[in-house]
Amino acid sequence: MSINVLSSFLALVGDIAGELPKGHAERSDQLVRAAESVVRNIAEGAGWWSEADSTKHYKIARGEAMECAASLDVMKLRRLVATETYENGIQLLESLVAMLTKMI
């Protein structure tokens, strides 16, 4: 797992959350929670001895990453995030999902 991809995505999420217009706190919270859940599930998966337990948490992390992508899609459609920011986020998520898929 590349920590650079994960940390870059978390930094981007922080930027997006800080820049969303007033009235979109729910969208911000949902994206932040899903992104942080990716990190927590990867950490929890790494802490288990059995492959089955680890895999379960990596699958959850992958699902949370997909939720982040869906959140970015909605924000882009609603014109709440710049195209460049959206594309950067999707690119990071594609890398993250690919890495998690290999771990499953």
Predicted regions and their residues:
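Amphipathic alpha-helical assembly/interaction segments
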Residues: M1-I104
